[in-house]
Amino acid sequence: MRARSSRGVASVAAGVLAFLSLLISANPAAAAEVTVTGAGSTWSQIAVDQWRADVASQSGLRINFSGVGSSAGRQFYLISQVDFAVSEIPFQPDEVAKLRASNRSWQYLPIVAGGTALMYNLKDASGRQIRDLRLSASTIAGIFTGRITNWSDAAITADYGRALPAKTIIPVVRSDGSGTSAQFSAYLARTSGSDWSRFASAQGIPNAATSNYPQFGSAVASKGSDGVANYVAGGSTGVGSIGYVETGFAVQRGFPVVAVKNASGNFALPSAANVAIALTKATLNSDNTQNLDGVYANTNKASYPISSYSYMITPTTGLNPDKGAVLGKFMLYFACAGQQKASVLGYSPLPPNLIKVVFDAVKKLPGAPAVPAINKSTCANPTLSGTLGEGASSAPKGSSAAATSGGGGTGAAATTGGAASGAAAAAGGIAATHAAAGSASGTGQYAA
């Protein structure tokens, strides 16, 4: 077993080196002198920052990125203050009108998949950290609309299987325009019954997903995913709090995330395998944006229901060709070798059909670098080898796999994708499903 593992590591390393040599072979001097700038999503920022560091150290590419939130990132792109943006939701109708009026071109391409997790800080009566919390969609909606305000509420007891101490719940929401808020509220709007519609009406917001989550009742609003995660993890002041972040932010801090009840009645954690399984029911619109209705309704026992993709937004015209070359090399890197780190960072890697979407987008850039064929020798994305990378089937660090064995659950093995074969099935299944559904039309699920 050890010998096979060593050969596998050597093979991956050789593939990464070959890919990096491809990236720097074309005009390395120009690449070293050009800086490409982007802004946007904090949901994706852990991955983007890792990839920026990788290409800077390995090939000298200079990529700047500011995690200012999806809404601000789109605005910076709209007024040409950045070369690319990253967002969990596409441009809204008013933004599209401004883009067209200014002749600013754009295209969407997926960069990474992940789960929007509910990170929490909760202790039992003896003061020990609770790490196996389970909640249903109705209970989550109750907490994040103000209907449920105490951890001893009967709905929480029913989901978790035992009573929690009587303590006020502190929901932590985003204070800034956020793709994370949009993804989370889209889930609530689709799964919570009347909770979200009543809340939306009371708050004067559309009965749909929103980038600007209202502050309500005992809720605390924090800026950025880091702000939400830091509040929840913030010592005594964070006890009793629960906030929505991309899984990686909880993993970084060693804090637990909720096992969410899915459409099968099972409770699932946002492991890379569970996210990949959930996204086998996602469909792509003609512009490569996502429709997640099937994800929320996915009846696979392992499916994590609050799963989604994040997009990069780039121009197809009007970009300096030298910048286009650098941006294109960065895109080729994160679609391939960069995805090896997705699972350990708290994400799930892009499947083969979405690698192709990225490669096709690179070809549309001014000054685009050479784009290789997609295979294991040119692209070190783990899904091309039928896996999701290291740690794909594990419970996120800080969370107990016991969270998946309550209620209608059937144990951690069932809900975390089991052994490596479960992750491999997810890697293959998501590609096949997206390939079949790639031309689905959208449903207008987002509202600014």
Language model segments and positions:
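Flexible loop/hinge segments at secondary-structure junctions
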Residues: 31-438, 444-446
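Secretory targeting and sorting signals
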Residues: 1-31, 448
